[in-house]
Amino acid sequence: MVRVVLATHNRNKALEFQQILGDAVPGLQIVGYDGPEPVEDGITFEQNALIKARAAAERTGMIALADDSGICVDAMGGAPGIFSARWAGRHGDAQANLRLLLDQLADLPDSSRAAHFTATLALVTPEGETTVVEGVWPGRIAREARGGHGHGYDPIFLPDGHDVTAAELGPEAKNAESHRARAFAAIVPVLRALSRPGN
């Protein structure tokens, strides 16, 4: 069995990670991280994910998995991007963040509301070896918040191929196709290799 520390204090994110991984990696045990959160001063999702994973690997001496993710709106040059969690100024105020984004896009027609979620996962071993993968979930921004599932910007994100928001999809449907699901699909082979006997 291999233990991997999940470098996040975000309960919603940790739950989503557990749900997505499920039984995909036999012999893998995900453990929580209670160490200090490093300053995320990178300018890309990849840089911030690596900062978090390296800090957790160094502190725990374990393999660490971290993500950095956000929503990127084409008409805003990719913003909020890495600033998604603090778009309205205060980190973690999801309601204020999505209200501000809706206000900023209020005058845009539906044809100009393209957006995507990005999730970048970084896996770092105690020896400093790194693997970085990315998942992208294309869609568009709705005109109002809808749905009670999910978190963050889910209530205003309409995934391509759906007329419902990510928050209306429900956890199973969302976890089958979200940006994190796509990133996890790319990291699972690496985790499986690490959990094989002899590694």
Swiss-Prot record:
GO terms for biological process: nucleotide metabolic process; purine nucleoside triphosphate catabolic process. Homodimer. GO terms for molecular function: dITP diphosphatase activity; ITP diphosphatase activity; metal ion binding; nucleotide binding; ribonucleoside triphosphate phosphatase activity; XTP diphosphatase activity. Mg(2+) binds at residue 68. Its cofactor is Mg(2+). Belongs to the HAM1 NTPase family. This is dITP/XTP pyrophosphatase. Binds 1 Mg(2+) ion per subunit. Its EC number is 3.6.1.66. It is an enzyme of class 3 (hydrolase). Keywords: Hydrolase, Magnesium, Metal-binding, Nucleotide metabolism, Nucleotide-binding. Pyrophosphatase that catalyzes the hydrolysis of nucleoside triphosphates to their monophosphate derivatives, with a high preference for the non-canonical purine nucleotides XTP (xanthosine triphosphate), dITP (deoxyinosine triphosphate) and ITP. Seems to function as a house-cleaning enzyme that removes non-canonical purine nucleotides from the nucleotide pool, thus preventing their incorporation into DNA/RNA and avoiding chromosomal lesions. Substrate binds at residues 8-13, 69, 151-154, 174, 179-180. GO terms for cellular component: cytosol. InterPro entries: dITP/XTP_pyrophosphatase, ITPase-like_fam, RdgB/HAM1. HAMAP family: Non_canon_purine_NTPase. It comes from Leifsonia xyli subsp. xyli (strain CTCB07). The keyword Magnesium applies. PANTHER family: INOSINE TRIPHOSPHATE PYROPHOSPHATASE, INOSINE TRIPHOSPHATE PYROPHOSPHATASE/HAM1 PROTEIN. It comes from the Bacteria. The lineage of its organism: Bacteria, Bacillati, Actinomycetota, Actinomycetes, Micrococcales. It catalyses: XTP + H2O = XMP + diphosphate + H(+); dITP + H2O = dIMP + diphosphate + H(+); ITP + H2O = IMP + diphosphate + H(+). The active site is at residue 68.
